[in-house]
């Protein structure tokens, strides 16, 4: 659903799968933020290794500020197709519009790889 106003680039399935894995590892061995309010606060504090935004959010205004804020703070961000899958990877029983990896824990190498590949996508 890359036609959303706030989606600035498409994320290949290979990278999306790695993002799900990194979120799950960080959830279990590090620290993550769940929900747009937590993500926004952590980005503003420069406390995010990777921000993750769902592509299927209606209305788009709920998350439209996140890519702009992340770029302003030079924080890497990525999109995932659905809020349900993002919520599941974040350990929630419901969908979430966004999440962030604060401390990657044992998934630091994976997060570094994702950040590198996302930087290539944006160029």
Curated annotation (Swiss-Prot):
GO biological process, one term: tRNA 5'-leader removal
Keyword line: Cytoplasm, Ribonucleoprotein, Ribosomal protein, RNA-binding, rRNA-binding, tRNA processing
Location of this chain's protein in the cell: Cytoplasm
Predominant localisation class: cytoplasm
Gene3D superfamilies (alphabetical): 3.30.1330.30
A GO CC term attached to the entry: ribonucleoprotein complex
A Pfam family reported for this protein in Swiss-Prot or TrEMBL: Ribosomal_L7Ae
InterPro entries: eL8/uL1-like, Ribosomal_eL30-like_sf, Ribosomal_eL8/eL30/eS12/Gad45, Ribosomal_eL8/Nhp2, Ribosomal_eL8_arc
One function term, GO molecular function aspect: rRNA binding
Described purpose of this protein according to its UniProt entry: Multifunctional RNA-binding protein that recognizes the K-turn motif in ribosomal RNA, the RNA component of RNase P, box H/ACA, box C/D and box C'/D' sRNAs.
Family note: Belongs to the eukaryotic ribosomal protein eL8 family.
Subunit structure: Part of the 50S ribosomal subunit. Probably part of the RNase P complex.
NCBIfam families named among the record's database cross-references: eL8_ribo (TIGR03677)
Name of the molecule in the record: Large ribosomal subunit protein eL8
Organism from which the protein derives: Methanosphaera stadtmanae (strain ATCC 43021 / DSM 3091 / JCM 11832 / MCB-3)
Source taxonomy: Archaea, Methanobacteriati, Methanobacteriota, Methanomada group, Methanobacteria
């Amino acid at each position: 659903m890359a036609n959303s106003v706030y989606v600035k680039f498409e994320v290949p399935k290979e990278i999306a799968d790695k993002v799900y894995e990194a979120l799950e590892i960080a959830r279990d061995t590090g620290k993550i933020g769940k929900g747009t309010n937590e993500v926004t606060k952590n980005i503003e504090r420069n406390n995010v290794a990777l921000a993750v935004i769902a592509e299927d959010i209606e209305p788009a205004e709920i998350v439209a500020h996140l890519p702009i804020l992340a770029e302003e703070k030079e924080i890497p961000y990525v999109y995932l197709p659905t809020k349900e899958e993002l919520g599941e990877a974040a350990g929630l029983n419901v969908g979430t519009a966004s999440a962030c990896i604060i401390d990657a824990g044992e998934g630091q190498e994976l997060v570094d790889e994702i950040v590198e590949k996302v930087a290539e996508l944006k160029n």
